[in-house]
Amino acid sequence: KVIKALICAAKNGNKVTVVIELLARFDEASNINWSKRMQDAGIHVIFGVEGLKIHSKLVHIGTRHGDIACVSTGNFHEGNARMYTDYTIMTAHRPIVREVNAVFDFIEKPYTPVNFKELLVSPNDMRKRLIALINKEIKNKEQGKEAYILAKVNHITDQALIEKLYEASATGVQIELVVRGNCSLVTGIPGISENIHINGIIDRYLEHSRIFIFANDGDEKYYIGSADWMPRNLDNRIEVLAPVYDKEIQADLKRIVCYGYRDTAKGRIVDGTGENRLWKGFRSTLCKGSTPAFVEADKTNVLFRSQEELYKEYKNTL
């Protein structure tokens, strides 16, 4: 549907540029076919950057009334949309929109020096800025200020980030993570990672979103985007994390992470044992029972299934 809409836009006289990554697992043939159809419709199709796989999910729309940008955690793929949990932010915030456009410029003219202030972009500066965000939490904790990290990712295997999280934990920063897949971080090591706790969810839908929350001494910083904490995402791919400033959306993102962290029905303990034991009972210093679903689960001591609870809540608001 997205591709057909782009083709329709081009046929209606709009200038359309599409960046498509041909090296997508299991979708190479489909991507080649759709690329030809878009080119036949007059769309300018770009096939990525040599040496850098494009993994970011971005849209930039120019209108007479102002430009709009979208940054997503998931692909524009109808099959994935039925099976994956993902989130997209659509914004007219001018600094973010300008920088999303700059990412497209970078893709068209690769290795051109580009500076980003709003977006965290790989391979430009994402690693450096993530480490800076963690360092800020360490510094705040040392100064007696509020400091914690909440995050939801697919994988954590980057050694430099893992070492930095260990340093934060050793300083006393509380770190609560939802990690669905590969995790090289070992929790519960005395003096090193005893302040890090990880829940992993395997349920009906594939957990695919990436959400990052930093306490920042009470003025929380929120980011969503395409990047996991892996060397390939930080060094060898074009990835984008975007800040989220809207308080209502921030609250929703925090609820998503906390629901995942508090899942006692499909959540498993991610630690060094590899036993994948299920969580039993509530355990969190950051995700306390502030929603009706949490309160009811605590009161009745029933299993809390995050995907089911989120589905019901979203369904009731539509």
Mark where each language-model region is.
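Short, compositionally biased "basic patch" segments
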Residues: 95-114, 129
